């Protein structure tokens, strides 16, 4: 498996596409399929008042979420191998948000790495002139195929809560 953009579709998806191929529906997320999917998402999130928007790809989704969540002086922390750092054509940085890449041998970053980066930032005498870490981005599974354990996820979440950082969990 390389990525979802380069693989074929499951036969049930192809069957459903063939069944609905000639349906005429409005575009831009205004069709009944998107309406049903949005309703399911709201229900699962237990937020009937939530806005749900569908985007055409992962890069666009990542860029939209990150650009919406961060202020211009804030950046996103991730593994050096994270696809927002390596494969998304610089879209995050093109939107004005630096990717603060942490070294990783297995594609995972640790809570202690994030905490160290954050504390080094706030204790730097010129921190106000530096990109502020505000979001932690992880891929699960990672780009290298490794999976975070529940304990690792809870530790990352704990550090994010402690320091007011957003935690963004994506899939590779």
What are these regions (language model features)?
Residues 9-58, 80-85, 91:
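Conserved N-terminal alpha-helix of the aminotransferase class I/II PLP-enzyme fold
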Residues 76, 99-100, 167-169:
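Hydrophobic beta-strand scaffold residues
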Residues 1, 41, 61, 92, ...:
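Buried hydrophobic positions in well-ordered alpha/beta secondary-structure cores of metabolic enzymes
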Residues 70, 93, 157, 161:
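Anion (oxyanion) recognition and catalysis
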